[in-house]
Amino acid sequence: MGQFTVVSLGLLAVFLSLSGAKGDNCPANWISRNGVCNKLFPDRKTWLEAEMYCRALKPGCHLASLHRDSDSTVLAWYISDHFKGAGHVWIGLRDTNRKRTWKWSDRTSTNYFSWNQGEPNNVQDNENCVHLWAPSGYLKWNDEPCASLHPFICQYKL
């Protein structure tokens, strides 16, 4: 029995050291989800200013892209739990050609949407950027003019 415990502990130590070697840890104040690191910045910026800020942080960093319900849930929890009263929060989705063709700033596939009911509605033909809608608990999206000022979430792949 004692030898089994020693071998088990040895295998556990090897597993933990190898899993740490993958580099799946995000820097302090960033959260990890599905192979990416995210951080909310409370500074209020336009969509383009926020995207440029993210890009300046490190190569490959952009406004956050969401590709499944679990992505939305993790970010909604993070914002709600750590940034009370943040208001709407920019994500990396926008309609660059103003034809209701939504694309992520990191150029990943646009295969998932979580629009709030009645959205996107393109009020005054001027809503071409997307934020997480605060009244939905950050689970739903709304289109908004890109010049609006909001906090934002940056993201980069591990």
Swiss-Prot record:
Q: SUPFAM superfamilies this protein is in?
A: C-type lectin-like (SSF56436)
Q: Which Cys-Cys disulphide bridges does the record give?
A: 26-37, 54-154, 129-146
Q: Which residues form the signal peptide?
A: 1-23
| Record keywords | Calcium, Disulfide bond, Hemagglutinin, Lectin, Metal-binding, Secreted, Signal, Toxin
Molecular-function GO term, any one = metal ion binding
Name the predominant localization.
Answer: secreted
Tell me which tissues or organs this protein is expressed in. Expressed by the venom gland.
What is the documented function of this protein? Mannose-binding lectin which recognizes specific carbohydrate structures and agglutinates a variety of animal cells by binding to cell-surface glycoproteins and glycolipids. May be a calcium-dependent lectin.
Which named protein is this? C-type lectin lectoxin-Enh5
Q: What organism does the record attribute this protein to?
A: Pseudoferania polylepis
